[in-house]
Amino acid sequence: MERGGTRMKKFEYTPPEQPRELILKLGQKITDRIGHTVTAEDPEYYGLEALVTDEMAEVALKMKVRKPMTLAQAVKATGKEEKVLEELLQEMSNIGLLEYNWENPKHEKQYVLPMYVPGSAEFFNMKLDQIKEHPEVASFFERMAFLPLQKVTPMVPPGGAGIGMHVIPVEKAIETENESVSVEHISHWLDKYDGKYAAGPCSCRYSRGVLGEGCADDPEDWCIGVGDMADYLVETNKGHYITREKVMEILQRAEDNGFVHQITNIDGEDKIFAICNCNVNICNALRTSQLFNTPNMSRSAYVAKVETKDCVACGRCVEYCPAGAVKMGQKLCTKDGTITYPKHELPDNTKWGPEKWDMDYRDNNRINCYDTGTAPCKTACPAHIAVQGYLKMAAQGRYTDALALIKKENPFPAVCGRVCNHRCEDACTRGTVDQAVAIDDVKKFIAELDLNSDTRYIPPVVQPSNRGTFPQKIAIIGGGPAGLSCAFYLAARGYKPTVFEKNERPGGMLVYGIPSFKLEKNVVDAEIEVMRELGVDIKCGVEVGKDISLDELRTQGYQAFYIAIGCQGSRKAGIPGEDADGVMSAVDFLHIVSGGNEDYRVDGRSVVIGGGNVAIDVARTAARCGSNEVSMFCLESETEMPASKDEVEEVKEEGAAVCCGWGPKEILTENGKVCGIVLKKCLSVKDDTGRFNPQFDENETMTVKCEHVYLSIGQSILWGDLLAGSKVELGRGNGAVADPLTYQTAEPDIFVGGDVYTGPSFAINAIAAGKEGAESIHRFVHENASMTIGRNRRQFIELDKENLALEGYDNAKRQRPAMDDKIDAHRSFRDAHRTLTEEQVKIETARCLGCGASVVDPNKCIGCGVCTTKCLSLIHISEPTRLGMIS
């Protein structure tokens, strides 16, 4: 069960039998719920009752809502002694019941009884200790941002009609608009209130956290008060003065994080009192348009538009759009013509009630694509890398941009350019024409930048905090692709994670499992060095569970753990003779040789049992270690072999015999050493239900003489004492049981990923899991942040390749990298595969059909411009009509 939950916490509140009469009257005075009579069960009562004394209520009842009153006027109205009243008014301001105003001819301090939202409900929630002591004020804010609007929202015209908050676009997105509205420019308001700015905490982030629906942002300093509000925040200890330069830093950080700029919208076109930087997952103001499905409640004067012909389908706009207005679609025409995408229904000419609302908007706005699908490459990739995007960038010579785009999802592009199982290529639409685009070869070319310390790409740290990097200590147990990916994305978000690796060098199976003739270790080292420069601390030679325990790490201050130790053990065949000298597991053999001992000798004949890529790696490695005859035996037929076709062809080219349909029966020994193996005929591998259940003909056997037998029939997890005393449950294959979305185990601070969760799998799967683990841990270490709300489920749909009208494509053949003729590709441990030339990359990237494109629904767009800060091709916002702010 996640910490914080996905549903709002209910604070304990029992209406009193004898309500405080003055609080009822004050609640009724301020409420904007038309025709509603406030009772002790209402938020108007329990919100005020928590903080407001009867004496305060008496004074407030002498005031008019939103009508400024000087101290002298208050003395006259209440009959109280001036000094006593001034102290009381100050206390009322400190808790948030009152605000200040100096906008009068004498520039005289005036006290204002504000409305609830925006107003006292927010001010109540700008002091965390106040909310924690009285969580009912958090509910008060949430309810008063909801209840008064239920019947109003369908009638709100563009611009917001002076209700609540108004989205103001990213200024860079509208700089080129010739007739842009001045009030839609943040600079207009900063100029108007020049020199009078203060930063305070976000009341939405604070209050939603107390209610258990928080995000993982640091709440401090996202609310920028201007003019009188700046002074109010400082004088009531809710904020601090900042310079214009600091304002710009906060605004830029907000844009980097995908937050939406909003300004207050209750004082007409000539006045605001705050600029907020809002996370849609917790913002009560953005909720008014998103939950009620009425964009006019928020939208600016602008709407986004994608230039489809230029869109590279990177999907960044989709990922960040707070309103779910952008989704992935397709650029290619179907046999019936161009796809027309549905538009969001609006309340303009439709009866609008609760059945039209979207209570799950935070999750639904994270749906990535239309049901008709998008680019197959992005869909098929476990990490959902923007393949089409980086191919187009490479075609334009924008190699650093392409590398940056890949690293949004994969910190190991150079590694994956060499050893990925390229499901993107298997799914590539171009493959229906001739041959798939050589996606991994292009990725390898791009990632060559990472092998040079002068050109490698180190992503900027983007943390949702205005107070620097996060202090929480996080431990990653296992330095393989899952663990290192988790560390990479945590570091990119502002953490300083520590990786504990039991081996002498990090990399896991990338170093100790994949032979150097496929993946040179300097390639792995270079990409790990990027992580170090990003802030990841890697401690090698430390086995957690042996050298130090999880509990000891907790005492050192570690708040979360990501366990990704992989499957380092082997499985036995359960046959006679498998303990003989000369029998070795594939994992152990590769660990010795790939881990740095390439001088290891294998004399004589070798038999490899297994039909996967690991078995092929063993066969090829044995040959390089001197074995004069290598044979592979597997249960499956050649078409059923789990190994990739390319791998099978390569091992055959190197002289190994691949014998399908045989399983081990007995290993023959002489004086305790292997001298041969008896194999039995496999009739079938799976039963009628598809489960692994091999059937053999015990009478049909074959004996093969050999001196070495390598068993590549499965891997196991070596937990040791790592989980001693923990609540982590183990399931199928002795793997950790965890939530399939968050990877959180039964021990709340322990998350798992990679092979310890899935069983033996591919590097790209582990990389994808590592990024999700980082997202979960980021949420977990921030108190009361939801583990699931507003989380991108990373679900994509492949377009229908059978229903495409493919015309006018480039006729070039697939480009292939040359081999280095100075290297013996069959016996050397060096990688003989060269990289594509720049000219080949241009030819190959031109073969991409450009299947996908982002599609904007203008009816959902709120004109925030966040998409323009993420777009890597061409998306812009324009002014469809003069919507503006309504006075």
What residue spans do the PLM features occupy?
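A short, conserved structural fragment
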Residues: 93-104, 326-327
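N-terminal Rossmann-like FAD-binding beta1-loop-alpha1 element of flavoenzymes
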Residues: 473-496, 616-623
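Short, amphipathic alpha-helical interaction segments positioned at domain boundaries
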Residues: 108-144
